[in-house]
Design a protein with these regions (language model features):
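Mature catalytic core of soluble alpha/beta enzymes
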Residues: 4-338
Length: 338
């Protein structure tokens, strides 16, 4: 749900700026139902039929992940994360290998970010989600979640209570009140898995999680714009990318207002409230799932701690602070289009 408008717009406007080979034409496919957001695939192909086959194969693969990682809906014959949440504390549930691999990856991101990205925060995030939806629907009566409710929910966010039995292929929540929410990672992770078998030379955006699968057929780079969080026209920067992901977390994407103060959706596990260090963080990283997690973690960390995390994985970032000043990791400027 986060980060789609700005980067998607950039994909649509900037994706075809470089020249293409004469024998191939630029095509674009858009799908609306995956991960409750917009998926756009841009690429070059010798014919519309050839591009359609490619885009439909990608859509089919993403749809499988969408159903498995969904925490809100059930699907015939599919055991998904909603199934797991409903089975908390009852019994181990046999899951598809894709769910097992996602949860293992989420645990790795949790460890790497010292708990700043915690998929076991579902109970806390649900309280904020309900308050935000109610506040958007009825702004005059918008309220914050009750402090006592947040503190009670936070008692059920211990990721060690998630028991993964790889040999049996089962998942069990030892805490019956624990609830998983993989929104900080799921889209990027799914996109990365699909891109492992996708053709080279595509630009794919899933809710703004942008992944290039290589240079264009003529060797040119894709160009992606980074939105100004102030809402002003134009981009903070445009970056040239080939085999890399571009993911942004920002305070301007999903929020509501209570007593004149905006409250966005990126919740700090330590405070149980929205992070206030940054307005936006954009991450450049070869792995889209990791980029998704890092963009959330860096949004909640001081720059020095965020930079140390980037150094660990060889990724780059752009931070926008509360005064709309820009801060760069050492290698970020190498991607900026001049």
């Amino acid at each position: 749900m986060k980060r789609f408008a700005a980067l998607l717009l950039a994909v649509l406007l900037l994706g075809g700026c470089a020249p293409k080979e004469p024998q191939e034409s630029r095509y674009q496919a858009t799908f609306l139902e995956l991960f409750d957001t917009v998926t756009t695939i841009v690429g070059y192909a010798p014919s519309e039929e050839a591009f359609r086959e490619t885009s439909e194969a990608i859509h089919h693969a993403l749809a499988s992940y969408h159903q498995l990682f969904d925490i809100y809906h059930t699907y015939p014959g599919v055991v998904n994360l909603k199934t797991l949440n409903q089975s908390a504390g009852i019994a181990p549930v046999e899951v598809d290998g894709k769910i097992m691999e996602l949860l293992k990856f989420c645990r790795e991101v949790y460890d790497a970010t010292s708990g700043k990205v915690n998929i076991a925060m579902g109970s806390v995030l649900q309280l904020w989600h309900e308050a935000r939806e109610s506040g958007i629907a009825d702004p005059a009566n918008a309220k914050l979640p009750e402090e006592a409710a947040l503190e009670e929910a936070a008692r059920h966010t211990d990721l060690s209570q998630l028991i993964l039995d790889e040999e049996a292929g089962t998942v069990f929540y030892a805490d019956p009140e624990m609830h998983l929410d993989v929104g900080a990672i799921a889209k990027g992770y799914a996109l990365e898995q699909v891109c492992k078998t996708a053709p080279e030379g595509l630009l794919i955006s899933v809710g703004g999680n942008v992944r290039a699968t290589g240079a264009k057929p003529d060797g040119g780079s894709w160009v992606v714009g980074i939105q100004n969080p102030t809402g002003e026209e134009g981009y903070l920067h445009t970056v040239e990318v080939e085999d890399i992901s571009v993911v942004t977390s920002g305070d301007y994407q999903r929020y509501y207002t209570v007593d004149g103060v905006s409250y966005h959706h990126i919740i700090d596990p330590e405070t149980l409230y929205p992070g206030r260090l940054w307005r936006a963080v954009t991450v450049l990283c070869p792995d889209s799932g990791l980029a998704d997690g890092l963009s959330t973690a860096l949004f909640l960390l001081p720059q020095a701690e965020g930079q140390a995390l980037l150094d660990k994985f060889g990724c780059e970032a752009l931070w926008v602070d509360g005064d709309n000043h820009l801060h760069y990791s050492p290698g970020f400027r190498d991607y900026i289009r001049t």
